[in-house]
A protein has these predicted regions:
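Acidic-glycine-rich active-site phosphate/pyrophosphate-binding loop
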Residues: 46, 129-132
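Generic recognition of short, well-ordered alpha-helical segments
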Residues: 23-27, 108, 132
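S-adenosyl-L-methionine/SAH cofactor-binding core of RNA-modifying enzymes
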Residues: 70-125, 129-130
Length: 132
């Protein structure tokens, strides 16, 4: 399946795809999905965890509060989105890590990003990503 020029392709890396699936069915956003303006693919990093417990987080190296996301499942998740890009014949998309510590996502930035063919978004709820 080739991607339509109008369709905005999103790969969303999230531990809770069910939470995001609901918003694709209602309101203005839901109409966009129904009219094929947007296509979203949910990628759960747990699918790339290597242990029996599907662990994707760990304590921060050197201590400190909170947990960090393990790099390996996150890298594999983004690589699976890159494979999707190639199969759809679209150019390499920007990867944006949405995190509480990051800058606020403002309207001007959203307008700028809307000119892209799509995005790979990482919806994080952790203190950060393991940098080891």
């Amino acid at each position: 399946m080739k991607a339509s020029k109008k369709m905005f392709l999103i790969d969303l890396v999230t531990l809770m795809p069910e939470m995001f699936e609901a918003f694709t069915n209602f309101g203005v956003v839901g109409r966009g999905f129904k009219k094929n303006f947007v296509d979203i693919n949910f990628i759960n990093p747990r699918n790339f965890a290597t242990d029996t417990h599907k662990t994707i987080d760990d304590r921060a190296y050197g201590g400190g509060p909170g947990m960090v996301m393990m790099a390996e499942p996150l890298i594999e998740s983004v690589e699976s989105a890159r494979i999707r890009e190639k199969s759809l014949g679209i150019k390499k998309r920007k990867v944006i890590h949405l995190t509480p510590k990051g800058p606020k996502l403002k309207h001007e930035k959203v307008k700028e990003l809307s000119c892209e063919e799509g995005l790979i978004l990482i919806a994080s709820r952790y203190e950060g990503v393991d940098e080891r």
